[in-house]
């Protein structure tokens, strides 16, 4: 969604600089890694959280999610030199400020921001158990001599001797049963890509429009879901174009990609680095294949490149189209290559759909014929679908794992109902069942610990208002599968369902709503600065 300024977004703090001292890098790598990622892998809450009691530097503004005051408590006793140092913006903050001052500014000196400290921080953010690339180097092996390895990598980057390695082709199952191809990059490629992404984000987080949410720092899927729900409810929306780009990551045109990057980046070394990653190719079954188009899905740089490509191909064009050609209200919410456009008038929706098809064709993209639909949806859909379409109820659409339906609240007013997609629900249960078979001979305590984390992570994303029945059904099904697994371990099992229920109530979290209503969270996020558009 967008407001008074469609470019308005929330900036996220820069990651802390790594320890630049020559001693202790390798020894601290593992402990710092665990400290960074000791929390769960579920989506974080978008609401501000309170700090720990012993955090001395916490302020009221930080707790409440507000901006800092000009002079915080305790700042009067701070040495004057330290005060001046804290007020000096970081190098990337100066880049961000320059990008904000001029939308036409082209940056010619970015490559030097890929420092040894930034490379080390990038290394520590990589999962220790991440699959190795074509070179077979693992996180543990690289950490044994981290200082020397990082210095050597940085030296090769500065000399121009760095060579991007091909990605190793791997496949993961999709919810529809097909296989999704992934490109597993080598460890050093991941480090450099993460560092380059951090540098480039200082520019593009200023440029990206407000209705773009996917793979952006400080933005989460639930913010996109909230923005969509608010837009449909409070704007005059009667039609929804649910769109998906077919094979997007494999269809990115390399020439157009470089041209788009050159709008903001004139640093030849940075552009050369991006070209190396695009042309590195993939290795599958020992055979190297050149990359004529696309960016490997799974590479650390790919989400940023994908967002830049659609920023120029879709976002800027769509925002201009609704300002110049739309007769009624138009809302847009995009998450990577999956986006939803809402319209007040059917003729606007049809003209936009046709123009979008031609626009994508110019840049080697194509809308997925099965996943792209134009449906009647909104506050008047229930009335019009019976009178005009002869349907008993409006159609539904899927977005970010939830099926969106037209409904009413307790007062009889229009409200969007969001429930977990049936395909996602069944796929998750199927995965839990398969994993339980592998863990059949583990102790009950070990199984309980794992299942508790699974259910907790599922609730963390899916526990939205109106989805309580799905949460309860998921917890019940997990308990039943666990019960059957324990019974299979012994033919003389004395475990009955009543006792199993008591065990489950002890170790599995109860089904309860964890997320607020979209109106509450969206209002807290924008803080009244921009209306829904």
Where would I find each of the regions flagged by the language model?
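Non-catalytic terminal/accessory segments
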Residues: 1-533
